[in-house]
Amino acid sequence: MSEIQGTVEFSVELHKFYNVDLFQRGYYQIRVTLKVSSRIPHRLSASIAGQTESSSLHSACVHDSTVHSRVFQILYRNEEVPINDAVVFRVHLLLGGERMEDALSEVDFQLKVDLHFTDSEQQLRDVAGAPMVSSRTLGLHFHPRNGLHHQVPVMFDYFHLSVISVTVHAALVALQQPLISFTRPGRGSWLGKGGPDTGQEQSIISLENLVFGAGYCKPTSSEGSFYITSENCMQHAHKWHRDLCLLLLHAYRGLRLHFLVIMRDIPELPHTELEALAVEETLSQLCSELQMLNNPEKIAEQISKDLAWLTSHMMTLWTQFLDTVTLHSQVTTYLTQEHHTLRVRRFSEAFFYMEHQKLAVLTFQENLIQTHSQLSLDIRNSEYLTSMPPLPAECLDIDGDWNTLPVIFEDRYVDCPATGHNLSVYPNFDVPVTSPTIMNLKDKEDNCMVNSNLSFREDLVLSTIKPSQMDSDEEVIRCPEPGENVATQNHMDMCSESQVYISIGEFQNKAGVPEDECWTGQTSDAGTYPVADVDTSRRSPGPEDGQAPVLTYIDVKSSNKNPSRAEPLVAFNAQHESRSSRDKYGLDRTGLSKVVVGGSHQNAISSDKTTLHELSTLGKGIDQEGKMVLLSLKLTPSEPCDPLSSTLREPLDIRSSLKDSHTEEQEELSVLSGVIKRSSSIISDSGIESEPSSVAWSEARSRALELPSDREVLHPFVRRHALHRNSLEGGHTESNTSLPSGIQASLTSISSLPFEEDEREVALTKLTKSVSAPHISSPEEAAEDADTKQQDGGFAEPSDMHSKSQGSPGSCSQLCGDSGTDAGADHPLVEIVLDADNQQGPGYIDIPKGKGKQFDAQGHCLPDGRTENTPGVETKGLNLKIPRVIALENPRTRSLHRALEETPKGMPKDLNVGQQALSNSGISEVEGLSQHQVPELSCTSAADAINRNSTGQQSQSGSPCIMDDTAFNRGVNAFPEAKHKAGTVCPTVTHSVHSQVLKNQELKAGTSIMGSHLTSAETFTLDSLKAVEVVNLSVSCTATCLPFSSVPKETPARAGFSSKQTLFPITHQPLGSFGVVSTHSSTLDEEVSERMFSFYQAKEKFKKELKIEGFLYSDLTVLASDIPYFPPEEEEENLEDGIHLVVCVHGLDGNSADLRLVKTFIELGLPGGKLDFLMSEKNQMDTFADFDTMTDRLLDEIIQHIQLYNLSISRISFIGHSLGNIIIRSVLTRPRFRYYLNKLHTFLSLSGPHLGTLYNNSTLVSTGLWLMQKLKKSGSLLQLTFRDNADLRKCFLYQLSQKTGLQYFKNVVLVASPQDRYVPFHSARIEMCKTALKDRHTGPVYAEMINNLLGPLVEAKDCTLIRHNVFHALPNTANTLIGRAAHIAVLDSELFLEKFFLVAGLNYFK
């Protein structure tokens, strides 16, 4: 077997050592070594960058390939010591010539980081004698194409709480004939027994044998020129040459693109010109030169020269890269943010949340508890958790894996629960319009007064794609009471003046625009239209207007006959101007649609109420093949609104068959979600992406839409595996439904990558064409259609756009063709039936037939927030700006069927969503959402049937019709997207032009990034994204760009992004690792990361099968922590506003250090948070005293602490463990504490026995506590068991329950675990238990206690109760058996504490 020597270099930088909480002063040293699997023959060497020969204690040195940092002394707590050592590990590997790339990807590289300590400085130089006190091992997941560029803060163990900041850069730098001898692993090495020295040395193979294969015999001199090399040998040589050159070229491109991105995003770096080696061109040139040679020796020599030439380029670039980025503080900051975001995103897996009505807290939710227990078991055994990929550089001890991470369920009790993706801080709205009025979205001045006398929440707003900047902390009105007038500032500004500008631009990658020159935020003319231009749309453009945008304007008059109905209507007119009008980025300006939406508040909208002012189209200037497709929406009064079902229709009408089938396999539809509020003290929350992976609409107490069984509908015309395989999302429409239809329509879904096995034949390079220019159907046809369909609400959608992967601001075209669709299919008229109202009949969207054009079948976008996709078609996602209103979503209602599992192969003659297919069956499911119901307003977007004509063109029809000021477009289809050429950005941005909303918005994000490919440089100005970049440059989507979206800290509330389309950082990481694939793994045939893909599919499958009642934090755009530990520049604390005092109280037989880790992770997670921790120690000597005594001690301690340090207190929070929680509650009732009651903020109860230990289900623990009480004469244990008084109502705990306290907190967070047998689970959660229900003597007293405790909480307006149910991954030990392990895991499990605080818990202390 021919073998090749590959050289990989790792640059490891040790930046800073942080003393978090070390116990011992003295001398410390970090030692780092790289370990490579002994199964692969290798040679390892290490060198320190820029080191001279002299070595001293105060400089780094190398011993046997282990790097010793300089020795440093630690004297103070919170001390930061700059290390600034950089080392290069060079690994020469002997690789099989057949699968070099795979072999390199599978090498197990590990970086071992050890902490050594001694009192004697000199002892640390004694390599053998200096003791190692703690060690961590980092797994480095290296991929030869992308290299590895990552930063990890490595935290040592509990007893040595300190962090060393480590940056790793790695690249494949050489491939060549083996030049050094390698030691073969000996027998038994696969068992770990064989060391590197046990095997034999490998003899070096001759170059010819390497090139031509083992079967090659060198001709003797006598044969001379008559010797002819066999065809097999020649083929072997050419293939070998091609594979090696291709791998080196990819490695070069990956490093170069990463370098370019770094230079672009970090202005402080010196900008240098980097030589570009175009992969295909260079490869074809090298191969063609080799083809011309016939002499075997010359062929071998030429191959060697080519490899040496490419290697020299690679080495030059690598050296240049290291010289630029090594130990550069800005690069470190950039990579730190990226790592933190991915890590938090990974922690958010298997973390569920659900919202309930506040009153539900008083009920016995036995089913909920049982569901949690069953789910935790299912998750542990599910492929979802077991297939979760690792981080690019991970440490199992601190990052965990599926086997060690806890599973957490959160139940939040709020006034207006949302069963959708909204956060509790963005509650539901009632938005009926008070009087008949024309809602002209153009009128900025009008504030829309909302009369919420109905329980329906409605939005009359069409969202725009780019959420303008919004102050994420601004007030959002919570569920107005009936009869209350509400004028929502920005929300209704949206409503009153939101002009929806959708400009669909065409992007073409010109040869002159290199991959790295994606536009960086400056707005080009194309696609940006100021408000002033709106009125010009009233005139029909003449032939000379070829370059002017066409605005389609629709007024919908509303009447107030039935205020519970409001129809959003959307008109899009997508037009292309002549190709000559492209700007420097190759953009076509396309027509804009100006939509004026009015709420029609009657059961039926008649056509006379809606005037289609203009559906003007460009007469000239359209591509010769291009035709405009006008989607018109027809609203017919009088039919009851059945849940829509969208189906593909073949020439023969399938509608009738759908009538019967639609109820069978309905999937729940998803709802839109509201904007996230950052830093709010309430956890942001949103929904599971596919569950109803959706954008939660403001309109959301929605009824479920249902699709007919996709199987029945899809079989006739859907290609079975293409989309399913291709979809990063596992192919369910649910994810697509996640977007309001139009939204999806104008975005690319990542839908076109073929998956490995059955799609190999689809050349990935063809995928690049997925965004090529579509043809637009003729304006004449479109206009005719619009006229013939005098619809009540015109619905014109941009259905086609020219697009390649380069985009201009203002363009919302990200098209992604489906590689599996047939070329050149004609698309006949497509009709989509739309139910606009509960009482209304269908409307039709007509798509005139266009020759050889394609459009994406778009799902219905229901104002109630759910999108419905036509089965069998992909949908594209678009980010829309939505009034900040929240939607409800039925957890049971699933977003659509696996309609997307398959890609349309040929377009059916008719796309129809027939009204006959509608049924009421979905309504009942959703009505249980709340007492409110939302009218079923559905705004169907055009069916997106995707077909590709011969040029791979594709168009989209989309109608963003959303109602949420910052919708997350939840769950955009995360299908592997088609690769866009040249790695340029394909942004989606529309300009929403309401200045009033703009001024209050902090968000810059407006793009919907599907998978990882779309970054709107315009929406995210690059300078604001130093730390984390949205995915840019790469439009390729390797599967790792999945739902692990990340949010740059500068844009904390990325409304407008669903989890699936939130910003992805540029991770530049190996394909198999968790997170997003590098931006530069851009455009050609990047392989899909099967591991990430399978994880995503497993996750979707898990959510589907289990019908999860609740949602995953991983589907949220913004999590609790967006700032990494140890940010480079902490804001100076301004103590004028007062500090936040956090009092930590330990439990029985505990001490002040018990809550040390809790304190540590809050401090690390909230740098500059003005937090002052009081670790209570007054009771640590005697926790067996009675509660009154301990209460007095704690109260004295708190008041003394405040007075001693003269603290100006703004807020007080309490964190208690076990029995400490009772002491805290007792303190709240004391008169001396009354002054501080109005400052109470958060009460975090960790396994607190609030109801005592009366109904403990562990006999062993009960017996132990009884014995301990007898031995210690413990008053507290007596009181916990209600034996301190014969009359239960005179017991301490009962009387404590009657006193006020908990309702003064903003957040009451109860953490409990069924595995904890020290404290009964129901007691920690303050809820009823089965045994108490059966107990006629004590049960009623127990119930009274619960009501006494929770009643004031329910009545308190500003108090939120949150319960957490934690399932730890515990080893089988005696501690686990008796329940102690879980009881103390909330204190000493780093994995639980980091997961809890980073994902959700930090919000309670902000």
From Swiss-Prot:
Concerning Gene3D superfamilies, the annotation shows: alpha/beta hydrolase
Provide the positions where the record notes the PTM Phosphoserine. 777-778
The lineage's top-level taxon is Eukaryota
Give any Pfam family that matches. DUF676
User: Which BP terms in the Gene Ontology apply to this protein?
Assistant: lipid metabolic process
Q: Which UniProt keywords apply?
A: Phosphoprotein
**What are the Polar residues biased-composition ranges?**
804-816
Q: Which family does it belong to?
A: Belongs to the FAM135 family.
Identification of the protein by name? Protein FAM135B
